[in-house]
Amino acid sequence: MTDKKRFPIQEVSKIAEKESWRKEINRPIYHIHKWWAQRLGSVFRAILLQLMVDQDTDVWDAFYKIHDFSDVTVLDPFMGSGTTIGEALKLGANAVGCDINPISSFLVQQELTHVPYQELMDTYEMLERKVAPEILSYYKTLDLKSGSEIPVLYY
């Protein structure tokens, strides 16, 4: 149960307001797919912290610190876009989530699966080699002065 007196509502509200303006930029991991009622990561981090830290710990002081709650397991049986699961993992807790909608389960699994950096870059470079020439062919225009075809950089 959360304690209203310990919850840093003023501080979290300021962060949450900014996060809510452009969720897909501020917390892109939870926005790989359109989802109903996406929750703000900053709010859920604060809620989870309040539930996990000692009663005498200031939740706001703990907000930006690195934590190891490996002795805690968080269950979210209605995980939706996975905000609770993602924030619990960031806090070093174990997390278990499920949802009646299989798309939710698939999306959250993809969001939270670690991809080795080199594998990601190799795949990106392969895609660039294979499809970039065709895609770039659609981004050309005629230079009004010279009449020659030039690449379009900005619209």
Predicted regions and their residues:
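S-adenosyl-L-methionine-dependent nucleic acid methyltransferase catalytic domains
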Residues: 1-155
